């Protein structure tokens, strides 16, 4: 009887181990609606090592800032790191000239063409548009007109490539001297461009600092939003560390019709990536 009983016990343990592994895998599926930002997470290791760490943490989708990391990194090198680790990219953030200045339009178009080419290599269809630092000696009205004109010049290129440019407004608390802050005037500006490929990146960290009234304002502008990012206030850490009710907020985001990944462009508190993952799983909505 000892032999069969022992085999039975070992089988039971193996079964429980399998169930535990399955439960863990299922819990990690709770990250499926999110994209880890590789420039704000996993900062204890070099950029090239963050892909493997992101996958180990349970993510399948990433976002990041520039393709060129200052050493001539081609998009193909990043794509290889993605493929080697079973990751997809939802969007990235090229470096832009301050194109409210009409003299910067040729550079703007060149950067746009390169960003489109990089997006093709990376297999993603979105990238962030900034380039709205205030220009000394140029009126605000002229800068708004110039920036809008630049977006209109970009639009045909993006439409032809079927890639979406994401205009990202900042905030005036800790992102000083920028033309676009909060939902105004970015939302009416993007509406005026009237392109299916010029939309908004709605970062709730910036919106809380600049606007507040998060759910109502997002719902009013949701038709112009093609990417969402989150980060709690204060500190720009994970949900649960600050004042934003992310459970209600993200339910409202989905109810308003946003279906794509939610970018996690925040710094995990105390650089504890594993704890930040647990906090995201505990949030229970994506």
PLM regions: where:
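Glycine-rich, proline-tolerant flexible connector loops at the mouths of alpha/beta enzymes
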Residues: 63-83, 131-134
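Metal-dependent catalytic neighborhoods of phosphoester/phosphodiester hydrolases
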Residues: 72-78, 105, 140, 272-274
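Histidine-acidic metal/acid-base catalytic patches
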Residues: 2-35, 40, 44-55, 123-124, ...
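Active-site acidic/histidine proton-transfer and metal-coordination neighborhood
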Residues: 15-19, 26-30, 55, 84-85, ...
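Mid-chain, structured segments of secreted extracytoplasmic proteins
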Residues: 76-108
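Active-site-proximal loop/turn and secondary-structure-junction residues that shape catalytic pockets
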Residues: 40-42, 66-68, 95-98, 133-135, ...
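N-terminal substrate-binding region of glycoside hydrolase catalytic domains
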Residues: 57-72, 93-97
């Amino acid at each position: 009887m000892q032999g069969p009983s022992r085999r039975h016990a070992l089988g039971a343990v193996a079964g429980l181990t399998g169930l535990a592994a399955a439960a863990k895998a299922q819990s990690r599926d709770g990250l499926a609606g999110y994209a880890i930002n590789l420039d704000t997470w996993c900062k204890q290791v070099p950029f090239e090592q963050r892909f493997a760490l992101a996958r180990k943490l349970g993510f399948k989708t990433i976002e990041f800032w520039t393709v060129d990391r200052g050493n001539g990194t081609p998009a193909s090198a990043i794509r290889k790191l993605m493929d080697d680790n079973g990751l997809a990219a939802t969007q990235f953030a090229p470096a832009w000239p301050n194109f409210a200045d009409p003299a910067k339009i040729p550079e703007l178009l060149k950067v746009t063409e390169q960003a489109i080419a990089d997006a093709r290599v990376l297999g993603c269809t979105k990238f962030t548009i900034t380039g709205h630092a205030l220009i000394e000696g140029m009126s605000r009205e002229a800068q708004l007109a110039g920036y809008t004109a630049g977006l209109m010049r970009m639009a045909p290129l993006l439409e032809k490539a079927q890639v979406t440019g994401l205009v990202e407004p900042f905030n005036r608390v800790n992102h000083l001297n920028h033309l676009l802050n909060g939902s105004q005037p970015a939302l009416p500006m993007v509406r005026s461009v009237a392109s299916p490929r010029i939309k908004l990146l709605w970062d709730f960290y910036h919106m809380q600092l600049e606007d507040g009234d998060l759910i109502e304002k997002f719902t009013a502008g949701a038709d112009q939003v093609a990417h969402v990012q989150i980060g709690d206030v204060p500190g720009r850490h994970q949900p649960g560390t600050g004042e934003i009710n992310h459970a209600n907020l993200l339910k409202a985001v989905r109810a308003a019709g946003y279906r794509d990944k939610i970018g996690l462009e925040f710094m995990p508190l105390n650089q504890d990536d594993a704890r930040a993952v647990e906090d995201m799983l505990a949030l229970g909505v994506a």
